[in-house]
């Protein structure tokens, strides 16, 4: 099959799009937002020249949908939407996109019923890692710190701000060897949370993240959602895939998907964060054991090959269905590991060849 992706987000370029190519599908990735700004006609030209079976997008387009959805309707090409901003932007971004899509995937299980209340069939598809990209590499002295955080300052989200207070602030207050990488919003004193220049490590290209993850003793994690049973930061899967020792704020999704002190470590308070960092900095062998376990676990359950299977199997089901034939549900076992099963959907083999 032929898939045209409209986003150059790493979860596509190094994730789902990359993996579909590895599985033998034909994939083209364009920056539809940039293209529409330069020349609105270029989108229709790209679609016509590639002639995709499906056009796929993630997140949200804003006004771009006003341009591209009429093109897809004229050409009879189905649209696939991965609502990667759920649940935070369900109403403002996801729902308008989903209403114009034939297949909808969400990272937040709790949103599935919300879609169904709007007559929209939705499937669960979490973030993941790509072992062909997310793996350990040669350490770099630039990132040889006790603790690092890679990400942007989204302190406008209450859960994210809470995580900063639990994970970052106590380490800053105790003067640990910590570097924070991301956009320079971190230095803006008008934000609800900011850091001093000596803590800021600057911007970091996505291709350099695995080097940073392979070099630091502890990689820190924050999440913008702390109420979802499934939605967590994509960095969780990526850092574990790179063999990092990952210490993160606790959320229900982290506990549902992973085991504490086995795959990663979570903290529920500033005091616990300091205690965990002091404990594991003094015990490199334990850090390495947990990091190996975490990498093995995501490689076994949470790669984009797993997601591509879920994705391709969902495309074998009718694009429009009743409330009773929808995709995914979840149960929690005694170890708090979430296990997914597909209801009334026949599992089919992935077609490894182009048509």
Show which residues each predicted segment covers.
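Catalytic-core regions built around general acid/base machinery
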Residues: 67-75, 96-97, 167-170
């Amino acid at each position: 099959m032929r898939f045209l992706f409209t986003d150059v987000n790493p979860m596509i370029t190094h994730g789902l799009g990359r993996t579909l190519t590895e599985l033998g599908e034909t994939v083209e990735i364009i920056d539809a937002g940039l293209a529409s700004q330069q020349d609105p006609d270029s989108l229709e030209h790209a679609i016509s020249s590639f002639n995709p079976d499906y056009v796929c997008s993630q997140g949200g387009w804003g006004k771009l949908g006003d341009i591209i959805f009429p093109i897809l309707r004229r050409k009879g090409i189905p649209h696939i939407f991965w609502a990667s901003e759920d649940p935070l932007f369900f109403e403002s971004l996801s729902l308008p996109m989903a209403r114009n899509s034939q297949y909808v995937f969400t990272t937040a299980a709790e949103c599935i019923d919300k879609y169904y209340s709007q007559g929209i069939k939705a499937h669960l598809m979490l973030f993941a890692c790509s072992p062909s990209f997310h793996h350990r590499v040669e350490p770099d002295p630039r990132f040889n710190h006790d603790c690092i955080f890679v990400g942007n300052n989204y302190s406008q989200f209450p859960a994210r701000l809470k995580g900063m207070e639990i994970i970052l602030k106590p380490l800053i207050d105790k003067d640990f060897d910590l570097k924070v990488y991301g956009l320079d919003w971190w230095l803006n004193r008008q934000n609800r949370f900011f850091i001093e220049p000596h803590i800021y490590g600057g911007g970091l290209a996505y291709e350099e993240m695995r080097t940073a993850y392979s070099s630091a003793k502890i990689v820190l994690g924050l999440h913008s959602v702390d109420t979802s049973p499934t939605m967590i930061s994509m960095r969780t899967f990526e850092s574990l895939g790179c063999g990092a020792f990952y210490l993160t704020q606790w959320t229900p999704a982290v506990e549902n998907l992973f085991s504490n002190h086995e795959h990663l470590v979570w903290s529920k308070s500033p005091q616990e964060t300091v205690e965990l960092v002091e404990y594991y900095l003094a015990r490199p062998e334990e850090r390495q054991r947990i990091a190996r376990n975490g990498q093995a676990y995501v490689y076994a359950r949470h790669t984009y090959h797993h997601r591509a299977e879920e994705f391709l199997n969902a495309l074998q089901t009718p694009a429009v269905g009743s409330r009773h034939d929808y995709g995914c549900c979840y149960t929690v076992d005694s170890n708090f590991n979430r296990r997914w099963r597909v209801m009334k959907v026949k599992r089919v083999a992935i077609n490894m060849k182009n048509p």
